[in-house]
Amino acid sequence: MRRVIQTEVDVSLEKDGYILAGKVDLLLGGDGKLELLDFKTSPRPKDSPELIAAYERQLCTYAHILERRHGRHVDRLLLYWTSEPLKEDALMVLPYDPRRVEEAGQHFDDTVRRIQAQEFEVKTPPEAAICKECDLRMLCHAEGIITREARG
């Protein structure tokens, strides 16, 4: 039987040279199991594996923090799409894979290492529409980090 353990849970983990922090929307438990649920206010995407993968990484990062800091094994990762009218369409169960949880933690270690080493090379420029809305677009242009001419 699933029950709410806690809502809006601040989680953090002191790593080598930085603190990894996040906020879990909902911790569920029961029968010795622990589940992480994240609410999404949009409808469930019909064809966006990249978006689902990003949300899975988010939940795996939370699982990494809980497992490393508190020794709590996470059993399931859940997304709940609040704009879906039907409950069966709203709840999405993501597969729990301990390797993905470890990769999520490693991703932040690698990113922080690159930031600390001042490795800011942009390997794949974003779409022009993203740059158009970005507050840092003038810096990119002035520093030659991203040029729209290179994108085509």
Where are these regions (language model features)?
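Short, contiguous acidic/charged loop-to-helix segments that flank catalytic cores in large enzymes
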Residues: 46-54, 96
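A generic fold-level signal
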Residues: 19-21, 54, 126
